[in-house]
């Protein structure tokens, strides 16, 4: 008999129903559950798949470069970044009539095109790319890297090149190489690129391989480095009248501490960025030499952890047993990696708009909005994944004997206190915030807006003032003109910071009031509730008072049959599933807040946000409804326009989102009956009954239907908001 899908599970392959296909797809990446898997093969498979992942990333970025070089307008955009719209790629669509062709032909193109809202033009311009040839070269280079990655992945699956289990378990060596090699050397290389290519490029000097060795990045070369006069590299920085990409107003400094933004590009000074990467490189190169490997010097991570026993025995045996627990659990390691990456991604969203690093990106409002929203949603999915794998760790990998009375065991021992405190915080935030919003709604409805409860965020304003924002009149730390920190800041360090923080045209430390106070607490409610669900799911994954033997049922189970009431919906998977809805809604509030606040800032009518954001009707009417007007006007006498595609996507997103509920609010028996009726009709219909199936059609399992529903809900939700965000922003600002 020919091998049927899935080949990794002979038990599933022999299943006579369509369950074989769905369960096969669901467990394809759960290598641990595959037939004949060993720990060594598990590590080797994951290692090889990383190369495949890299190949896909390189291919994708290569495609971006290639299409912009081929169909974009990079060279004409460079001439006037503020007024030429950057083109992502051409659109070829046989359905386009003349109105559509005209609507989508823009940015100086000869036919219909898509506009780029990803910020790649600004990024490439900042790092020194100037011609289409540069873009093609980059695309080709990344294509080669992609091919090399694929070959490396294949190679590491060959018997001779398969790394051993001990190689994967060597934490010290891996940490040294990742810290020094991955972060240290790459940061140093990037600092080098900025100094040798990007900074000269910003001063009108075109450095490529043919003149790379002839152009000195600094007039004094390596002399200041070798003689210890490093401050010479910071002298004669670009002036405030510097025109980016030209020598007009340019200086010669390469490593500075100016602070603030380049007046023309509204982005961080390139010389500050180079300095930052050099410092990061130094730190990581040092950090990558800290752990003990072949030479018997440096720290042993196990010894470090075992020594961490808090005084007074207040945390039991401290970190004893943690080294082996983490080192032997891929899920624990993945959970830690995802938690870190999730936080970093959210920080990227925050910093890309508040401290923009790329030239002219701050004036491309649609791109700013798209990048913020994109990174926040990505962060949300990554963070929920961290808790999912944390729960799988507790079910599959946690060993109580190995972790007796250490910090991990003690987390489980007092989980009731953790969960109930989170629950209390969520309830407090939810009822108080909703209470304030609803009170304000009623006051507005009754025509007495002066009776609203409006709370000034004085603590946050004080923190902003301490960092130098003077508009609140707090006169503290950096906003106190008489203080030593203020006076030192004008000359010694970051002289541009205080100018930037008090400049109203950027997004640095936005002025906040009662509307911000309320939405901040609404977001805090969402964050705490999402965390509550995720933390409870992980801490109760092994068992709870209701179901002490939960771990024996695995990560995702629907119920333990009818004989045992109350065991439905309490698997660790169900907690993850529920948390994703909360995560999406929380990030919805975050992005609504960010977008509305910025639209009013960019349009110069901040009072609209300040006055309308203190009650729910204000959000619904003046943000959602008002800004979706271009998307919901249906067919009109003017026909097609460049926002039509977003209007269609807005509708389609709602459709996908609503389809999710068909899977979420239904029961398996209903679908099973429907399928059997359809199968009966199929078998009795002439011609149709010539087509037979090998697998008996059965309804999706409860857990699978939930996953399908969740996927539709998530994708529809994001499609809908993406269309709204891009159309409402580009419709106003072009």
Swiss-Prot record:
GO molecular-function term, one example from the UniProt record: oxidoreductase activity
Cofactor stoichiometry and binding remark: P700 is a chlorophyll a/chlorophyll a' dimer, A0 is one or more chlorophyll a, A1 is one or both phylloquinones and FX is a shared 4Fe-4S iron-sulfur center.
Cystine connections: none
First-tier enzyme category under EC: oxidoreductase
Transmembrane segment boundaries: 46-69, 135-158, 175-199, 273-291, 330-353, 369-395, 417-439, 517-535, 575-596, 643-665, 707-727
Any Pfam family: PsaA_PsaB
Keyword Plastid: yes
Annotated chlorophyll a B1 binding sites: 654
UniProt keywords, alphabetically: 4Fe-4S, Chlorophyll, Chloroplast, Chromophore, Electron transport, Iron, Iron-sulfur, Magnesium, Membrane, Metal-binding, Oxidoreductase, Photosynthesis, Photosystem I, Plastid, Thylakoid, Transmembrane, Transmembrane helix, Transport
Annotated binding of phylloquinone, by residue: 671
Residues binding [4Fe-4S] cluster, per UniProt: 559, 568
Bilayer topology annotation: Multi-pass membrane protein
Highest taxon of the lineage: Eukaryota
Compartment(s) of residence: Plastid, Chloroplast thylakoid membrane
InterPro entries on file: PSI_PsaA/B, PSI_PsaA/B_CS, PSI_PsaA/B_sf, PSI_PsaB
Residues that, per the record, bind chlorophyll a B3: 662, 670
Reactions performed catalytically: reduced [plastocyanin] + hnu + oxidized [2Fe-2S]-[ferredoxin] = oxidized [plastocyanin] + reduced [2Fe-2S]-[ferredoxin]
Subunit field text: The PsaA/B heterodimer binds the P700 chlorophyll special pair and subsequent electron acceptors. PSI consists of a core antenna complex that captures photons, and an electron transfer chain that converts photonic excitation into a charge separation. The eukaryotic PSI reaction center is composed of at least 11 subunits.
Family: Belongs to the PsaA/PsaB family.
Full protein name: Photosystem I P700 chlorophyll a apoprotein A2
Record organism: Dioscorea elephantipes
């Amino acid at each position: 008999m020919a091998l049927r899908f899935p080949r990794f599970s002979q038990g599933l392959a022999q299943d006579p129903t369509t369950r074989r296909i769905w369960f096969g797809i669901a467990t394809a990446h759960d290598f641990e559950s595959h037939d004949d898997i060993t720990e060594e093969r598990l590590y080797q498979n994951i290692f090889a798949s990383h190369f495949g992942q890299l190949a896909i990333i390189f291919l994708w970025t290569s495609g971006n470069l290639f299409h912009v070089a081929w169909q974009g307008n990079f060279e004409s955009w460079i001439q006037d970044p503020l007024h030429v719209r950057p083109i992502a790629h051409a659109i070829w669509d046989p359905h386009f009539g003349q109105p559509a062709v005209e609507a989508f032909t823009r940015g100086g193109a000869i036919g219909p095109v898509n506009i780029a809202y990803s910020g790649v033009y600004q990024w490439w311009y900042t790092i020194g790319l100037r011609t289409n040839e540069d873009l093609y070269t980059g695309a080709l280079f990344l294509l080669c890297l992609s091919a090399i990655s694929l070959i490396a992945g294949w190679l590491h699956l060959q018997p001779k090149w398969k790394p051993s289990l001990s190689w994967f378990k060597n934490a010290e060596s891996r940490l040294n190489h990742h810290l020094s090699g991955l972060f240290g050397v790459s940061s140093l290389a990037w600092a080098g690129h900025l100094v040798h290519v990007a900074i000269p490029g910003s001063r009108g000097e075109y450095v490529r391989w043919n003149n790379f060795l002839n152009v000195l990045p600094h007039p004094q070369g390596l002399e200041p480095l070798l003689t210890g006069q490093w401050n010479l590299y910071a002298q004669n920085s670009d002036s405030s009248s510097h025109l980016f990409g030209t020598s007009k107003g340019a200086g010669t400094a390469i490593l500075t501490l100016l602070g603030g933004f380049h007046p023309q590009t509204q982005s961080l000074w390139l010389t500050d960025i180079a300095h930052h990467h050099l410092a990061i490189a130094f730190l990581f190169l040092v950090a990558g030499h800290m752990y003990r490997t072949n030479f018997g010097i440096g720290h042993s991570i196990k010894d470090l952890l075992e020594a961490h026993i808090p005084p007074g025995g207040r945390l039991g045996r401290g970190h004893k047993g943690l080294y082996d627990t983490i080192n032997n659990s891929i899920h624990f390691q993945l959970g830690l990696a995802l938690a870190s990456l999730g936080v970093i991604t959210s920080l990227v969203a925050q910093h890309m708009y508040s401290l923009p690093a790329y030239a002219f990106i701050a004036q491309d409002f649609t791109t700013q909005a798209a990048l913020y929203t994109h990174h926040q949603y990505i962060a949300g999915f990554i963070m929920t994944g961290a808790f999912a794998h944390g729960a799988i760790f507790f079910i599959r990998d946690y060993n109580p004997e190995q972790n007796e009375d250490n910090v991990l065991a003690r987390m489980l021992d007092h989980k009731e206190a953790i969960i109930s405190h989170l629950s209390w915080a969520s309830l407090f935030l939810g009822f108080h915030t909703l209470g304030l919003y609803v009170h304000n709604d009623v006051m507005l409805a009754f025509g007495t807006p002066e009776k609203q409860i409006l709370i000034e965020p004085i603590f946050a304003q004080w923190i902003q003032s301490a960092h130098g924002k003077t508009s609140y009149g707090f006169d503290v730390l950096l906003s106190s003109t008489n203080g030593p920190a203020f006076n030192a800041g004008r000359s010694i360090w970051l002289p541009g910071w205080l100018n930037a923080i008090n400049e109203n045209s950027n997004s640095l430390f936005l002025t906040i009031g009662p509307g911000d106070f309320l939405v901040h607490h609404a977001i805090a409610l969402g964050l705490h509730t999402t965390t509550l669900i995720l933390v409870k799911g992980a801490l109760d994954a092994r068992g709870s008072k209701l179901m002490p033997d939960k771990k024996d049922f695995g990560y995702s189970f629907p119920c333990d049959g009818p004989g045992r009431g109350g065991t439905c919906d309490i698997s660790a998977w169900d907690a993850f599933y529920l948390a994703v809805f909360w995560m999406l809604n929380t990030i919805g509030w975050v992005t609504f807040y960010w977008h509305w606040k910025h639209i009013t800032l960019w349009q110069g009518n901040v009072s609209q946000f300040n006055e309308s954001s203190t009650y729910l009707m204000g959000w619904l009417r003046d943000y959602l409804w008002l800004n979706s007007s271009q998307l919901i006007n249906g067919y009109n006498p003017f026909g097609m326009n460049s926002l039509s595609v977003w209007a269609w996507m807005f509708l389609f997103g709602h459709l996908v989102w609503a389809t999710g509920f068909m899977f979420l609010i239904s029961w398996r028996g209903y679908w099973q009956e429907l399928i059997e009726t359809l199968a009966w009709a199929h078998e009795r219909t002439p011609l149709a009954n010539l087509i037979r199936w090998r697998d008996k059609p059965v309804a999706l399992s409860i857990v699978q239907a939930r996953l399908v529903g969740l996927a539709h809900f998530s994708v529809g939700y994001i499609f809908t908001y993406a269309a709204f965000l891009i159309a409402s922003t580009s419709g106003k600002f072009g």
